[in-house]
Amino acid sequence: MKLPGKIAIMGGGSWATAIAKIVLAQSESINWYMRRDDRIEEFKRLGHNPAYLTSVRFDIKRINFSSDINKIVKESDTLIFVTPSPYLKSHLKKLKTKIKDKFIVTAIKGIVPDENLIV
């Protein structure tokens, strides 16, 4: 069964990589936001995340990578947030695109530092 609409993975860590692999198995393609361009370029070159789960291979032709969070949000129907909890606020501050009509999924776990918020 293929998942409907365009799905975005928001984060580039090991948890995001694992979720991206699962979602891509059920989708034609995905959008993937990572904050670092150097990691994106290395991922494209190697076919896997250079920093996390390096044995997990991806079909790079089916992934639209970008370090522009607003571009990824605009081009997606569903946003799966998988950023580490300490970076949640900094990522959301960059967000200028409206998310009102988006389907939001959070796979964030942990505590937001300085605020003791559990997510």
Where are the model-predicted features located?
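Short helix-loop-beta connector
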Residues: K2-P4, E75, I99-K100
